[in-house]
Amino acid sequence: VQDFAFIDRIPGRKILLKGNHDYWWTTAAKFYKFCEENGFSNQFILNNNCYYYENVAITGTRGWFFEEDAALGSHNDKIFKRELIRLETSLKAAGEAKEIYCFLHYPPRYRGYQCREILDLFQKYGVKLCCYGHLHGDSHRLALEGEFEGVLYRLAAADYINFTPIRLL
């Protein structure tokens, strides 16, 4: 609750998405109920939707990361396919936005791994910026920062940005 209270006190609307440790937040309804019960009024989630800020569509989903869990096979494949559907639903919701920013928890490209399906969706919908997290500690040095295939990538993991929000617009 303290973390959400801190976030709520920051001026402006906050748009959040689920990470790999957010087991308590199983549905959007549970998240919004939690916010209501705690008096948090300016926190929203990316969940099969998008939000607009001026001419920018803010899209995204958790994503998925195969490299570490390849042995899990079909379980991973089911989750991955669901995340692709969620991402495309969010990107479609952007409509004719002038610019599309996409937020993922997992990196779509890391070390020798790249998620071609996600990268192809970025191309199909004209994503200009992708912010992602998940990488911590020594893995920062292998993160994709900068442009790749016309998309600007930014690592926004909390410890990488020194627990300080970064301005994107």
What do these predicted ranges mean?
Residues 6-10, 33-40, 61-72, 131-152:
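Short secondary-structure transition/capping segments
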Residues 14, 19, 58, 87, ...:
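Divalent metal-coordination and catalytic microenvironments
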Residues 9, 13, 62, 82, ...:
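Arginine residue identity/basic-tract feature
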Residues 151-169:
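Short, basic/aromatic-enriched C-terminal tail that caps enzymatic domains
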Residues 1, 20-28, 50-52, 65-69, ...:
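Active-site environment of divalent metal-dependent phosphoester hydrolases
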Residues 1-13, 22-23, 82-99, 168:
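N-terminal active-site segment of His-dependent metallophosphoesterases
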Residues 1-53, 114-127, 149-151, 155-157:
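Core catalytic region of metal-dependent phosphoesterases/phosphodiesterases
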Residues 27-117, 121:
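Conserved catalytic scaffold of divalent metal-dependent phosphoesterases
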